[in-house]
Amino acid sequence: EPKTQIPFDPELAKSLLEDAGYSDENPFPKLEILFNTNEDHRKIALAIQQMWQVNLGIEIELVNQDWKVYLNREMIGDFQISRAGWIGDYEDPNTFLDLMRPNRGNNKTGWENKEYDELVEKANTINNQSERYEMLYKAEEILIDNMPIIPLYTLSLIHI
């Protein structure tokens, strides 16, 4: 399995910021998080803002937009960080991996990786499940190494 979890290590993160030249005298630039008007999304944005400020000293401005404006800003790339979500709508790794392929409506990052795209594309033509999963596994490793998105949490719902 690819390493899919990044440990919570604020001291390592601070050290990496220092290595990159950031300090009290040269603070990390203020960032904006774009999110759409929804109470749950606001709570998540507030939690991120607080955690980054407390643990890393990074100042975050929250930018709350109505749904149409939010979608438009995402589509044209008018954001630094965007709070977004995805629900796996079918039981296959491709439900998430296909999101990051270039020229797809849900890839709002602008990230492209030719090898990643070729692996996902080729995997979609293979009938042997173990061979297909091996290709998707390699694609996932590329995605994790490049990290164009930061998965922060998984929503869990219980229905009775």
Predicted segment positions?
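Short, solvent-exposed loop/turn and secondary-structure capping segments
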Residues: 44-46, 93-96
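Extracytoplasmic/peripheral linker and loop segments enriched in polar/acidic and small residues
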Residues: 6, 40, 54, 58-70, ...
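Append "and occasionally in soluble cytosolic enzymes with long acidic Gly/Pro-rich linkers
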Residues: 1-50, 54, 115, 138
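Paired acidic/hydrophobic, glycine-rich loop segments that form the ligand-binding mouth/hinge
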Residues: 80-85
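Residue-level "edge-of-site" marker
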Residues: 30, 66, 87
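A ligand-binding cleft/hinge motif common to bilobed small-molecule-binding domains
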Residues: 88-92
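Residue-level preference for short coil/turn positions at secondary-structure junctions
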Residues: 27-29, 77, 145
